């Protein structure tokens, strides 16, 4: 039995929104970094202890220094590109620090 078209439309919008939420959380990259005295030299040029978390509020990112048996790495989490349907619109983030500074999407469900 097929769903009525309005119900199908609502279900599709919610599925798209769920996919959007998954994409928003996917902005993590890991880069090998220089080390100094057992610490990471971050993208900011500063020395950071292993497991230390720091933020760059200018580009809305979170950084973490990690060390495993292969070397030192900086994990960088940033906002990701958002793809959304035409009945939705982009809204500014609610804060100044990652992840609250990332844009979001709001949708009109008729």
Curated annotation (Swiss-Prot):
Residues 1-26 form the signal peptide. This is U-scoloptoxin(16)-Sm3a. Belongs to the scoloptoxin-16 family. It comes from the Eukaryota. It is found in: Secreted. GO terms for cellular component: extracellular region. It comes from Scolopendra morsitans. The lineage of its organism: Eukaryota, Metazoa, Ecdysozoa, Arthropoda, Myriapoda. The keyword Disulfide bond applies. InterPro entries: SVWC_dom.
